[in-house]
């Protein structure tokens, strides 16, 4: 079977690795154009491109797949199937119709819940009990196609966006390989999604990461976990930015953002409802530290009565 793979970030690269170890032929890889990254803003290839180059697989990086030339280039590859994972470009119907068996997608949620760009973080933020990967046939709509296969994992009370991402990146690739086998032998039939159950996972926005201490503590605790390792929740103290990487639910009352107490166990801050104990912070110019380490060296900065977010 001739497969064209389309994907961009590390999550997608894990799927490409599994396909490279499978009996299927990867005839080409599509990925986003190289982007500036790092302090020097040097053009860097995507994780998928780097892997493809290392395996001498032809790489295509069109700005769009909506024009006839790009579509003809894809058709010339004569793909039996296109596997799409976090590619970042919309595929028009003309592209979906090119492969003999169509296009399939590995999506990091239990569809139809959390269609869209940030399903992993939105599941943690919402307090969902479980997440997973759905392999589906692609349609022109956003994550709307018939579902071929699902794998499920519980979301634990200490899962972050990062830990859930890594777990799903391990679960998704074998599911895709299994789905391809089912398509090849005709044993796998798609299940139509119930649009009434659909929710949308909006793209992450850095502005969302600014902590609004008037919100309930339970919501903020989930947000802090969801946005770790990116974009990372933050607030201000004494005019300086403070990144908050971990927190636990606590008790106490005060003005939103008010420091209620500080100890080696954590920095207790009042929220709109109850309080949070901040257990891992990062100050400007420093690395992320447990609050017990910060408390030993910067105790005066975290005096009770000070207010975060002002």
Curated annotation (Swiss-Prot):
User: What Enzyme Commission number(s) apply to this enzyme?
Assistant: 2.1.2.9
Task: Write down the superkingdom of origin.
Answer: Bacteria
Give the UniProt keywords, A-Z. Protein biosynthesis, Transferase
Q: Name one Pfam family in it.
A: Formyl_trans_N
Instruction: List ligand-binding residues for (6S)-5,6,7,8-tetrahydrofolate.
Output: 109-112
- List the catalysed reactions: L-methionyl-tRNA(fMet) + (6R)-10-formyltetrahydrofolate = N-formyl-L-methionyl-tRNA(fMet) + (6S)-5,6,7,8-tetrahydrofolate + H(+)
Q: Which GO terms describe its cellular component?
A: cytosol
Main EC class of this protein?
Answer: transferase
Q: Does the keyword Kinase apply?
A: no
The record's annotation in InterPro entries points to: Fmt (IPR005794), Formyl_trans_C (IPR005793), Formyl_trans_C_sf (IPR037022), Formyl_transf_N (IPR002376), Formyl_transf_N_sf (IPR036477), Formyl_transferase-like_C_sf (IPR011034), GART_AS (IPR001555), Met-tRNA-FMT_C (IPR044135)
Q: Name one GO molecular function term.
A: methionyl-tRNA formyltransferase activity
Q: Does the keyword Lipid metabolism apply?
A: no
Annotated PANTHER family: METHIONYL-TRNA FORMYLTRANSFERASE, METHIONYL-TRNA FORMYLTRANSFERASE, MITOCHONDRIAL
Q: Which family does it belong to?
A: Belongs to the Fmt family.
Briefly state the protein's biological role.
Attaches a formyl group to the free amino group of methionyl-tRNA(fMet). The formyl group appears to play a dual role in the initiator identity of N-formylmethionyl-tRNA by promoting its recognition by IF2 and preventing the misappropriation of this tRNA by the elongation apparatus.
What is this protein called in UniProt? Methionyl-tRNA formyltransferase
Instruction: Name the species this protein comes from.
Output: Pseudomonas putida (strain GB-1)
